[in-house]
Amino acid sequence: MSTLLYALGRWSYRHPWRVLVAWLLLLGIAGGSAALFMKGTDNAFSIPGTEAQAGIEQLSRSFPQASGTSAQMVVVAADGHKVTDESYSSAIEHTVSSIENLDGVLAVTDPFDKMVTGLVSDDGSAAIVRLQFDGQATAVSPETKTALKDFGAELQQSLPEGSQVAVGGDLFSQSLPKISIIEAVGVMIALFVLIVTFRSFRMAWFPLASAIIGVALAVSLIFVATAFASISSTTPLLAIMLGLAVGIDYALFIAARHQDQVRAGVGPEESAARATGTAGSAVVFAGVTVLIALIGLSFANIPFLTTMGIAASVAVAIAVLVAITLTPAFLGFVKGQVVGWKRRSRSSRSSSGLARPEPTNDAATEESVPARRSAPAKAKRGFADRWVTGVTRHPVVTTVAVIVGLGVLAIPAASLRLALPNAGMQPTSSEARQAYDLTSEHFGPGFNGPLIMTGTIVTSNDPLKLMKDLATEIEKIPGVKTVALATPNQTADTGIIQIVPETAPDDPATADLVRELRAQHDRLLDKYGVDLKVTGFTAVAIDISDRLGGALLPFGVFVVGLSLILLTIVFRSIWVPIKAALGYLLSVAAAFGVVAAVFDWGWLAGPLNVDKIGPVISFMPIILMGVLFGLAMDYEVFLVSRMREDFVHARARAGGADRALAVNAVRSGFTASARVVTAAAVIMFAVFAAFVPEGDASLKPIALGLAVGIVIDAFVVRMTLVPAVMALLGEKAWWMPRWLDRALPHFDIEGEAVERELALHDWPEPDTRAAVVAEDLVLAEGDIELYSAASVRVEPGDSLIVTSADPRAARALLLTVAGRVAPTGGRLRVAGHLLPERAAWVRSHVGVALLDGADDPVAELRRAVRGGAPIVVVDGADALTSTAVRDRAAAVLRDAGSPTVLVSATDPDLARALLAEARRSGTAVLDLSASALPSEVLS
């Protein structure tokens, strides 16, 4: 992958206008499509397979008047007045008759109707007008909502001064999130951090511009998707938040690597290609981990959450693609002007501001002025160097302090409560929130979240008495304040019971009441013969919260298990992945603890503009776990991969490893990567934190959790706990069983393939024209070597016969040359392309004919040469036993032009006969049975 990214980076650098115009064109198409086809977001939460959802579906079929969404108008009389006064009751009745004509309204309940009870408060200070709509909240038109609010405003004006009217209910329980100026502050902070990091205004704009283009494209595609999918209003904002954060960071990693290389003297074009191949490989790996975690949200089996995860993963995928293409393109615009201003050296100027003279090595001067000789000044150590030295010098104290500290910070997480958003979570300036609070104050909190029980009563001879008896039974259950309604439908085949709980819809006691009502199912079925289901908006919200709570453990096992597997593959270590996974769990627990302390305990609720203390949105934990997992892996990879690189190089130089060498590698690797990781973490924190003060009530706890989680994971876990634990483990940190090392695949996330290509650029000679060059090639399976020390050179148009007592060895060598099998040692270049790095190109340009066991060997050979492959490998020439078959095969090779042919056979004479008949010269023989001795060129 790194070699492909290397080529992509070079191409993007050379053609910056093409890349930029291509992305802008895609953005224009997506934006135009969104403007034409988008249908708006949908906040209707549903959860198939639950009792609440089944109840709603049953009501929609048999009792549609009760299955749709509802709203309510709360009227509160002025002090000293009652709503039963003529000035109030007449105005309310007039409003009720006006509302009945609204489009989509099925029924309006007059609180003064003699058939209705409970809609006028006990003290007469307030009344509720209930409205029932056709369909769910998303089916009600914006015009109807606006008209309903207008009726409320007109009623307010007609009532005596001091009275209050507020419109709310389920229809208005969801607020539409919006972008405020505060979010722009996060972007400006990110720009400032980029300027400081790059020490260049020009370079600072590149990550920001690429991230904005990627986010705009992702959001446009999300709105296009609303034309054929149900997408919640929180989804675009989540995509913006994630897309900005990872988009800026991914471009930062590539641009920072490029700047360091240019400062070191690498040419700008070569540097852009290398940065894309090396840092870009890590970016792709990091992006894939985030994608997997987001797609893993489908574990909860909740459609809207699955859609949210997919939409957010699209934003991350686009951020990766933009980073590896648009970033090198931006670098191509400025060429070599990326170094930035020089860091001011404190030792280069005197206190008076005059430059100090540079030290001289002139021996004569030193001898003539011996009194002025002094020891050279020590280079000033950076903060990162001093920090990691202190951490690794006291690893036990550091480890214990971090674990205990994060454990204490996680304590509030035990009290974290979850619920779907309702009007009570909206700002106090919201009319829906005012209606919610007025209802709670005058009628009790349960009136904001009534429950519905419904069932088929077609077998009853007296449906009215049956519903009355059921209401009496249910009113006895603890937690039920009153049964507001118990009635059959017009056809008397379905009954509905509306229950008002004593507690608010997001109170845990209401969830307990739902479970208790369901626990009464069998008893009521036996006694009354009615199969009752508990449903309604509140019950659906509780079911979703329960489903999400149940999904946390399997999702946690998924992401932790995934981190163990991925990091084991990347770092070839057992202890590093375990340490990383445990660190991730500490970060998540601490982030949960901070969110609970703010939203449940009320700490810093005022400064953070938290309007209501209470439960947080149900899908906050699973989204926080998924996103933080991907970001934590980012920091782990960028920090620890540099430590591993330094350790491997130091071990090779020293011929072995000990604890001191391993600790030095931890320190040097940390110091080399701390600047970029620090900048990336600060940027992510700024972007996430900007969504907290004025953010949507649903997004606010997610943004706070991510902001805190990023700070804790980057600075406390990765940059403090990780080096301490690595110092404790010493050289054992990089231990891995040999059998596991052989079994696991290799991921090149640090661009080792690019580095190898650069190192072997002139091997075997600059601009070689050889078709195949192999030097000390080895292929082993476990402890068994299929072949070893295979060295050969074949020029274009020549041939090679590979022979061995074991046909598997010859076939393995040919498949290695064809790019189908990766060698385990040695060097190999095919048609100018180094293997295994360029195996994809070789596979598409080298034909393979496996004659042994083929039904028609000639047809197999014909298929291999089809398309004009410049190199053809033919395994098992022994299958061409008859002269006639061999002649036909030779004719196929002749007709193919002049490809380079590599043939394997246990009997080399058969292969010679085939090649002679094909009129080929310059044939070499490689005998793998003789320890792959140098090839013999035959005349």
Where are these regions (language model features)?
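Helix-to-loop junction immediately C-terminal to a conserved catalytic motif
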Residues: 818-819
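Loop/turn-to-beta-strand initiation segments
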Residues: 868-871, 895-904
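Conserved beta-strand
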Residues: 774-777, 785-795, 826
